[in-house]
Each structure stands twice: as structure tokens, then as C-alpha cells.
């Protein structure tokens, strides 16, 4: 940071920030994990930091605001010591608006204090796994905008207190997904993904992409391919899910010439294509799917909508359509002790179902709105304008004359969809230009 910027920041040191809204919507949820022993939830967002609830979603507290980054890619609670929480920063879905991170963080007191544990140049950490000794595996995607060597799978040895890169392909290939066998913490699957975001297009896939498996905690890896039943040719992004009730059943959503769902019934040794119907909605962006903790054939697939299969992925029906809750879904926590309870995160915030997905409740008090740009006009009192990711463009007052303070009713939605820039006309109060 330049000396000039630092000097300017000193002028604002004594100012207190205040929220002016709007509170009519939430924003993009990217990660969910739960300390079930104490009923503590952690929810990460694309640019709104990490939030904690000790009341199963009734009340929320921001616990990451003092850190150098607010984009969350992964959150993992230790099963051995539930007060230990790891957070990977950087959003793991690199569209045009992808937000980079600054490494991986650890809290040893349930989010009260944090320490950066390294991997600052990985840009995006989308998955974290922990073994039975609290050693950590981190899936680093790397920079979305060009080659960099800080990609792949990293292993943190708690006893030694240091990181080791245990899976690396090349400077353009990162790890987009990482799952651990629930019955064998030495067995992991890593989805390596070659990709690059450019201002004018996006390259997804290449010779670096592929599905890798280890059975010795990452000391050695085997790349799975056509011989094992996976598609030939260059692959794109791969999403992986292991059935908790039967870890020999493994699913993979594979972006390729024909994007399809694949299944292994022998722990990943051999694979067969299940279907290419009802899957593959923008696979570079949507690769999240989950298996019912109690039923190996019951799957939920997150994409523009939420789809459900009860026959091992052969057929899909709509669980959540475009209406009812916000579309574009990215995160899910399926209660392992009560599969009827499902928490789901999307571009509009957090939702919960307590009847297996038949009915859903929106969690209204998570202020995660992701503003791309803000502006203001010259009225008195002046108004603030902002374009929200997938939640419209809004106009609201900086302050009001009535005693109730700024209310949701004081805000006006100017346009729907993805909001970006709003430029008020300085000479005409009623004119605003939108991008």
C-alpha cells in the first residue's frame, strides 16, 4: 500500500461505519459447515465474510470482519476439536465477478480470533478436508487470471506446523474439488482443473484437468482416466461426492465433450456413465452435488435450480425451481444425523428445509449483498446507488428526516437481475443511467 493511500486512510480512522441497507435481500452464500455438538453454524459468502449462529440460524454474528479479506471459499469445523475452525478464502466459482482470497485461516476459539496459516498466493481455496488427527488438506485453485505455481493440493501437518504441496499438475491447473472417504481418512479424491478467466472469454478444461485418487494420505496419487471408465479427451471441471452411508459409492460430475454424471461402486476403481440428461448446466460454474447421508441413491444437484434424484442419478426432478427461492445455488449442508434437515446457499442467501426439501424457509437476517459499484447523487439528503450481484440495482437515502431511521421502505429497486453501475444525472434528479 502506498504512503499516500496510508496517509489518506488515517483521516477516516475515527469514523464509525453504519449500515444503511438495503435489507430486502441477502447475497451469495459459498460455504456452510456446522459444529453439531454445540449447534453452531458457520456460513461463508462471496464477499461478505464469515458469519456464525449459535441458535440454528435465528441470530447471526459477523466474525471475520477484521481480517484482510472478506471472500470465503471454504469453511471446515474440526470433528476432533469443534472450537477449531479453518477458513479458505477466495470464491471458488470463477465467473466474471470472481473474488480472490488471501490464504487460509484458523481459529482455535470458535471464531473469536483468527490467524493466517499461509497459502496467501493460492488466491482461491475451495475445499478443506481434515483427517482424524486434525491434519488439513486444502484444495487450491490458484489465480483465475493467469498461470501461477501456488495451485493443487496442500497438506498441513499439525505436529510439524508446516505445509507441503502434495499434488501439482502445472501452473494453469488447480484443485477444484477435494473429498475424503468418511471411513478412511487416507483415501481422497482430487479434481484437478485447468482453467483461465480472461476479460473477453473463459477457458475451461485442458490436458491438466483430471480426477486423481490417493489411498495413502497424498503420498502417491493415481490419475483416473479412460481405462477406469471415465471419458476420453480433455476434461473440464469435475465435482465429486462420496455416499456417507456406503463409501464404495462415488459420484463424479464431469465436464467434457458430453458433460455427464459418472458413478463408481467399487470405491473409485471403475466407473460407468449414469446419464448426460438433466446435468451439465454451465459445469464450469455449477459442479456441486451431494449424497443423502442415509441413502446412497438420493442425490441433490445444485445449479441454476436445485435438482433431485432418488435412483442414483439416472433421473432428475426439480426440487427448487427458479421461483420460490433465489436461483443460482452453490452450497449445501445435509444434516448427517437428520437427513430431513437441509441448509442451502445461493445468490440470494441462505435457506433451510426441515422436511427433506418439500418446503423451504428463507433466512432473512444475513446481510451479504454483493455490491459491484456504488454511486451517489447531489440531492439533500443525498441518495446512494448500488448494483448488486444477481439482486438488482437499488437506490436509498444516506440519512432520513424521520425518527425511525432508514427503513427498507426507503429503498427503491431501479432494475432487476445483475446490477453493476448506476450513474445519476447531476442536472436532473429523476434521471439515472444503469449498466
What are these regions (language model features)?
Residues 4-435:
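Beta-propeller blade termini and top-face loops
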Amino acid at each position: 500500500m502506498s504512503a499516500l493511500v496510508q496517509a489518506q486512510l488515517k483521516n477516516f480512522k475515527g469514523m464509525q461505519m453504519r449500515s444503511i441497507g438495503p435489507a430486502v435481500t441477502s447475497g451469495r452464500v459459498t460455504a456452510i459447515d456446522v459444529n453439531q455438538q454445540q449447534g453452531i453454524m458457520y456460513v461463508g459468502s462471496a464477499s461478505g465474510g464469515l458469519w456464525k449462529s449459535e441458535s440454528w440460524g435465528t441470530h447471526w454474528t459477523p466474525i471475520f470482519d477484521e481480517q484482510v479479506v472478506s471472500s470465503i471459499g471454504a469453511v471446515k469445523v474440526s470433528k476432533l476439536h469443534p472450537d477449531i475452525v479453518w477458513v479458505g478464502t477466495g470464491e471458488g466459482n470463477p465467473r466474471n465477478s470472481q473474488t480472490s482470497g488471501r490464504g487460509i485461516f484458523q481459529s482455535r476459539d470458535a471464531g473469536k480470533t483468527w490467524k493466517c496459516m499461509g497459502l496467501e498466493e493460492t488466491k482461491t481455496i475451495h475445499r478443506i478436508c481434515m483427517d482424524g488427527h486434525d491434519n488439513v488438506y486444502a484444495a487450491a485453485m490458484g489465480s483465475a487470471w493467469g498461470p501461477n505455481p501456488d495451485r493443487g493440493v496442500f497438506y498441513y501437518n499439525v505436529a510439524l506446523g508446516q505445509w507441503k504441496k502434495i499434488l501439482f499438475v502445472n501452473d494453469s491447473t488447480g484443485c477444484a474439488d477435494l473429498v475424503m472417504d468418511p471411513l478412511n481418512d487416507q483415501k481422497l479424491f482430487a479434481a484437478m482443473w485447468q482453467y483461465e478467466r480472461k476479460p473477453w472469454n473463459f477457458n475451461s478444461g485442458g490436458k491438466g484437468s483430471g480426477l486423481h485418487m490417493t489411498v495413502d494420505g497424498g503420498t502417491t496419487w493415481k490419475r483416473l482416466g479412460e481405462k477406469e471408465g471415465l471419458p476420453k479427451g480433455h476434461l473440464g471441471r469435475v465435482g465429486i461426492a462420496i455416499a456417507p452411508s456406503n463409501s464404495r459409492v462415488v459420484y463424479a460430475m464431469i465436464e467434457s465433450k458430453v458433460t455427464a454424471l459418472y458413478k463408481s461402486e467399487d470405491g473409485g476403481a471403475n466407473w460407468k456413465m449414469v446419464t448426460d440428461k438433466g446435468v451439465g448446466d454451465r459445469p464450469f460454474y455449477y459442479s456441486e452435488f451431494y449424497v443423502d447421508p442415509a441413502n446412497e441413491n438420493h442425490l441433490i444437484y445444485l445449479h441454476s435450480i436445485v435438482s433431485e434424484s432418488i435412483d442414483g442419478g439416472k433421473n432428475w426432478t426439480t426440487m427448487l425451481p427458479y421461483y420460490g427461492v433465489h436461483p443460482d445455488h452453490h452450497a449445501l449442508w445435509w444434516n448427517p444425523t437428520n437427513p430431513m434437515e437441509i441448509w442451502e446457499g445461493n445468490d440470494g442467501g441462505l435457506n433451510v428445509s426441515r422436511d427433506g426439501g418439500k418446503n423451504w424457509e428463507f433466512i432473512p437476517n444475513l446481510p451479504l449483498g454483493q455490491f459491484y459499484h456504488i454511486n451517489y447523487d447531489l440531492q439533500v439528503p443525498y441518495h446512494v446507488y448500488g448494483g448488486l450481484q444477481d439482486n438488482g440495482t437499488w437506490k436509498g437515502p444516506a440519512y432520513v428526516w424521520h425518527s425511525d431511521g432508514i427503513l427498507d421502505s426507503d429503498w427503491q429497486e431501479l432494475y432487476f437481475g445483475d446490477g453493476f453501475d448506476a450513474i445519476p444525472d447531476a442536472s436532473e434528479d429523476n434521471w439515472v443511467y444503469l449498466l
